[in-house]
Amino acid sequence: GPLSQSAGHDLDYIAITGALGAMGRKGEPPSPPLNLVGDYGGGTMFLALGIVAAILSARTTGKGQVVDAAMTDGAAVLMSMFYAFHDAGMWKAEREANLLDGGTPFYRCYETADGGYMAVGALEPQFYAVLLEKLEIDAADFPQYDRARWGDMVTAFETKFASRTRDEWAAHFEGSDACVAPVLSIAEAPAHPHNVARQTFAERDGTMQPMPAPRFSGTPATIDDGSDLGIEEALALWE
């Protein structure tokens, strides 16, 4: 396309797909989602999938092909559901006015007494019911999809979550199906019990890093410091 030779970064790529414009708080500039959407989600993942698909095709047809994996294309594909919502009249251009952009009281983050945050994602009725039960809020006061009550619902949730620390709330919701989780920092995430149990992170040479994903039953990933591995040895492992 006309921008193929122009300088740019993740933020620029997703800006022209509608993705960036949908993220952030109402009345404020869009919030950069790190560089996850364009570089990795829209670029690397689609390129990897494209390479695998092209290899499978070559094995079947005997012919190779060029894989054109543009980050703008990939980011646009990631927005497919939201374009469908928009065309069906179910998505507004204004941020924090929709189901999944913080526009609903039961799908957003709330600040806790210690300045931490809890993520609430109780979209389905059964999970919303558990959320209200754990917050000790009468379900009759706040029917889930009564938009006229959402403003008061937000206030009630804010007041509740502000009454305890993040870790206290995490312990309170542990084991429940309220779809509530503590918002952890990069430094904190490796120590979360779920991540520890799954060995989601591993330390190598004093550096904490995520383990490879997805996982394969026949060829599980392992960590090797690679200090004695030369080029020839590395290439031999790929044969």
Region locations from a protein language model:
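Active-site-adjacent "lid/gating" segments in soluble enzymes
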Residues: 1-118, 122
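Flexible, small-/acidic-enriched active-site or ligand-binding loops
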Residues: 147, 200-239
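Conserved PLP cofactor-binding pocket of PLP-dependent enzymes
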Residues: 174-196
